[in-house]
Amino acid sequence: MASLNKMQLIGNLGADPDIRYMQDGTPTVTVSVATTDTWKDKDTGNKEEKTEWHRVVFFGGLAEIVGEFLKKGSQIYVEGALRSRNWTDKEGNKRYTTEIMAKEMQMLGKKQDNNKVGNARHGDALPADEDDYYDF
């Protein structure tokens, strides 16, 4: 049976991107992207909103573009796939996270200073061995 793992977000960066490099030299950026849902409360008539934070990981050329052209508050469109991973931290605690592995990105909103690239696509966002994609 066929399946689909595709995420699409339009949101704002919660912090300035920080480019890091894997052992093989591949650039990577992990950012938190905020999305906000708004609705009218049917009992009070008040406008309500809820913000969700999404971890998004960029690799290679996409990571370089995000690191160079985006900053806290930048609005972006991201398309990618959900990936979950777990690990044991330095204190021995079992940790778990779910992230969006970005395959496409488009900058939205106001034009940033030095913003020369409007959208980008990365044909193979993950390294060949996914188990190694966080080795720094």
Swiss-Prot record:
InterPro entries: NA-bd_OB-fold, Primosome_PriB/ssb, ssDNA-bd. Residues 127-136 have a biased composition (Acidic residues). GO terms for cellular component: nucleoid. This is Single-stranded DNA-binding protein 1. It holds the Pfam family SSB. Residues 4-109 form the SSB domain. It comes from Xylella fastidiosa (strain 9a5c). Homotetramer. It comes from the Bacteria. Residues 109-136 are annotated as: Disordered.
